[in-house]
Amino acid sequence: EEVAKSGIYIASDVPAPRIYPIGLHALDTGSSVFVQSAQTSGEVEIVIHVGDKIHVGVGSDHTDRALETVSIPGSKQACVNHLAPTFWAWDDIADTWDDCIMRSWVDDRLYQEVGVSKFLSPPDILSILKERVNNLPDKNYMVYCGTYVSVDKALGYGNKWRYQLETPKLKRQIDAQYDVVDILNEVKSGFRVPLFNPQG
């Protein structure tokens, strides 16, 4: 609903959860995310890492919202997906998983807060991937698992993003943050190539 209000088309004819492949170049754990638009925003998501064992963590799917009105898959490649470098072993967290909470903040304002019980569990996500992805490897891949509406039900923009995964029962949390750097501002006004080609 919040993205639809911004003119972003959701492929409702494709069964949810919808899958958007991204390359490894679109993952980053650094302190800055570089963009070319003032209309970009993050959104907190559970991240699954499938290796010899399953681990869970948290990341921010930072997205160019202007480009997203034209192509959702393209917008996913235009900005990196930020990743917190800490993961928990699924076996250690599975029994208390439904009590975990995700949060994000933009410019120190609470942007999202949601319990992970609102989402499919990591095992359910991986089961769906096996049904819908061609040649899914047995291991060595990651999955960002989708997000939830912001607290004010509107897309937020800002310069500083922070996100968190907390397990209250185990008193553990994963935190990460990054600054947004609009590199288009390096080019003087009047010399910037438009984000979209002129129509007509």
Q: What is the meaning of each model-derived region?
A:
Residues 1-138, 142, 149-200:
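Catalytic-core "active-site belt" of small-molecule-metabolizing enzymes
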